[in-house]
A protein has these predicted regions:
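Extracellular loop and loop/strand-boundary signature of outer-membrane beta-barrel proteins
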Residues: 110-111
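A solvent-exposed, acidic/Ser-Thr-rich amphipathic alpha-helical stretch
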Residues: 29-102
Length: 160
């Protein structure tokens, strides 16, 4: 892979990641499941959501919590840093990076001087689909630092 191809791949996968988090932050993740392959996997800590239906179900639950729960996160921002992209073939790539998650229990603008709720390692396997473009085969957040306030994706216990 030459330098131009590496830059184009990095840009395409950076755009996939930023569009995904924009969907989550600006639209509550209502269409976040569409960023995944039909059998795609979303992992946050110990929670696993396999397939678009389960991913959509999580974001529906998350949005409902923001509306109905008194102390639930209502304003979020996900910041992406140190994105590293590695091609693993013509139509597959691995993405590594860091996601910092900020959340507040009030609507924006939220007065906040607290540190992020979560800083996690990001590990994605991405696949290029001829019709849909780049999609997540798997999208994993492995918590590294957490505040005492757990983000919704960690607070839910899918093991019960």
């Amino acid at each position: 892979m030459n330098t131009h191809e590496e830059v184009m791949l990095w840009h395409a996968l950076y755009q996939l990641e930023t569009r995904y988090w924009h969907e989550v932050d600006a639209n509550g993740g209502r269409n976040a499941h569409e960023f995944y392959l039909p059998d795609g996997l979303m992992v946050v800590g110990h929670n696993r959501f396999q397939g678009r239906d389960k991913i959509k179900e999580f974001y529906t639950w998350r949005e409902r919590q923001a509306v109905t729960a008194i102390s639930s996160v209502k304003t979020t921002r996900h910041l992406i840093n140190n994105l590293f992209v590695e091609s693993s073939g013509d139509s597959a790539a691995r993405v590594l990076g860091i996601v910092s998650f900020y959340g507040a229990v009030v609507r924006a603008p939220a007065p906040q001087s607290k540190p992020p709720m979560l800083i996690a390692d990001l590990m994605n396997d991405c696949v290029l689909d001829a019709d849909s473009g780049w999609q997540f085969k798997s999208h994993t957040l492995q918590p590294i630092f957490m505040s005492h306030e757990a983000p919704p994706s960690i607070a839910i216990d899918t093991r019960r």
